[in-house]
Amino acid sequence: HCPDPETEPDAFWNGEEFLAYLKKTTLKPLAPNYENWYAYYHLGILEFRKGNDKIAKEMYETSLKLQENAWALHGLACLSIHEGNKNLAALYAQRGMELKRHCLSYQKEGLKILSQCEAYRAILQQYAVMDEDMKSIGRVQYYYALGLVKTGRLEEADKLLNSEEGIVVDDVREGEDSIQDLWEILNHELYGGKQILPFRYEFHAN
């Protein structure tokens, strides 16, 4: 199975038996998957989950050599974060985002990785080249506002958060108050803490 890199990967198989089978059918020169980018990507995922970072990196890199793909780049970004190399992780994430420019889920994941890397200028650069529909997504707007705040563009962030529409994030996780945190930073820096937090940003109100 060697899908087009443009398509999202299938659900992954797990388990030692499948890993052994995949190695057997992939790693030797005459193996049927020897030049299959997807097989090496899959091996990278499985090895990373087992904590075999070095082998996972080799698998992801081989996948990329065979066929540049956003999925192995994402794997390398996650691996680089795990190893504490935020600068490299941010580079991998940005290249992946370039390849999947019109895939909302990939773009949101890329912005998340960039925020974990504290690559706030990169967040702003990626946001700038998104289409207008994608820019209107609440989760995307949150990362944009984060980038604005962290790069000192407080007035622009304030205009976004305190606009009539505000930022509406439909996929807020339980216990997540990151938009509230941003608003409180702006309130402190721009208004001396005198503003009242809008109810829409009180994610623990209920």
Question: Where do the language-model regions lie?
Answer:
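Eukaryotic alpha-helical solenoid repeat scaffolds
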Residues: H1-T25, E132-N206
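Hydrophobic/aromatic packing residues within the alpha-helices of TPR/SEL1-like helical repeat arrays
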Residues: T26-L27, Y60, A93, Y127, ...
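Short coil turns that delineate tetratricopeptide repeat
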Residues: Y34, Q67-E68, R101, M134-K135, ...
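Alpha-solenoid helical repeat scaffolds
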Residues: Y38-H42, W71-L76, S105-G110, G138-Y143, ...
